[in-house]
Amino acid sequence: MSVEIESIEHELEESIASLRQAGIRITPQRQAILRYLISSHTHPTADEIYQALSPDFPNISVATIYNNLRVFKDIGIVKELTYGDSSSRFDFNTHNHYHIICEQCGKIVDFQYPQLNEIERLAQHMTDFDVTHHRMEIYGVCKECQDK
């Protein structure tokens, strides 16, 4: 088993444990949605998740996807990302990280920059706020769109 598959399975097991601890029933559809989110690096919309899973789950609906995403978000295992357009995207990675977004195709890529965490501490120190989190987005044009 590859390291990536082992990592996905580990994340899935931890997420299922969190759901069970919250009293949430584990269904095959719920597992499939979680597995898709964990293995996806594209920050999918609910519609994209539906398109990917509907061949294997013909009875699944977009409403089922949204309902499960809401449950995952409420428990804290998924983040909902809202941007200028009307569609929400979902990110399994709930740790502090940042996004760079293509202005042409909407592609979202994660990146890490540990020094930005210092900004949170500095803001808290300078304002006496109890800082709970922060969000940073950088916009540009991805390599694929540049090459078109």
UniProtKB/Swiss-Prot annotation:
What family classification does the UniProt entry report for this protein? Belongs to the Fur family.
Entry function? Manganese-dependent repressor that controls a regulon of oxidative stress resistance and iron-storage proteins. May act as a hydrogen peroxide and organic hydroperoxide sensor.
Q: Which PANTHER family match?
A: PEROXIDE-RESPONSIVE REPRESSOR PERR, ZINC UPTAKE REGULATION PROTEIN
Instruction: Output the lineage of the source organism.
Output: Bacteria, Bacillati, Bacillota, Bacilli, Bacillales
What subcellular locations does the record give? Cytoplasm
GO terms, biological process: negative regulation of DNA-templated transcription; regulation of secondary metabolite biosynthetic process
What keywords sit in the KW lines? Cytoplasm, DNA-binding, Manganese, Metal-binding, Repressor, Transcription, Transcription regulation, Zinc
Q: Name one GO cellular component term.
A: cytoplasm
Per UniProt, Zn(2+) binds at: C102, C105, C142, C145
Looking up Pfam families in the UniProt record yields: FUR
- Superkingdom assignment: Bacteria
Return the protein name: Peroxide-responsive repressor PerR
A GO MF annotation of the entry reads: transcription cis-regulatory region binding
Q: Where is this region: DNA-binding?
A: 1-84
